[in-house]
């Protein structure tokens, strides 16, 4: 490929790139759905323990990624109930698999989507939603046709930020999913291995790739904010 140095094959370069996008896409879909629903609920809910629950939602944002990875290993490990149940159902453990990379990326990206969604839904005038329900609309219809469109700017921002975070996840993925080429080796882990092995040319190629992608994502958000 003309854009790549002659010492780098297209397959060698694109394998972790494609894998990263696949992992980020699936993790992003999960995070967008769960983050939107959790944000909508928490923006209006009032119950004992709400602050504690919200703190748990936001913890992955401040915890070191290695700690997140360790917690995931404990939760999904062979000695845990969840880990044993998954291994019994699917005949293999989840640790060091493609799905482990998805789970790790989703966990660290969730707080960004949740916080954006909560802010967007909290800014909606409750009277607008109440008027629609008085006219006979169900809660689900009000949510889909009124709440989501009104919160769309915040939801879009949260979606892009969470996708970017999932794409750039390193520590939790390395601990929980490992660094298996073609299976769990995403761009961040591939860059680390390339640099550690002295392959600076390949590392630079991947660094430029992820910087450009991240720049375009953030640029898109800024463009939307100014229009």
UniProtKB/Swiss-Prot annotation:
One of its GO terms (cellular component) is plasma membrane. Signal peptide: none annotated. It is found in: Cell membrane. The keyword Lipid metabolism does not apply. It is a multi-pass membrane protein. The chain crosses the membrane at residues 17-37, 57-77, 94-114, 142-162, 201-221. Belongs to the binding-protein-dependent transport system permease family. CysTW subfamily. This is Putative molybdenum transport system permease protein YvgM.
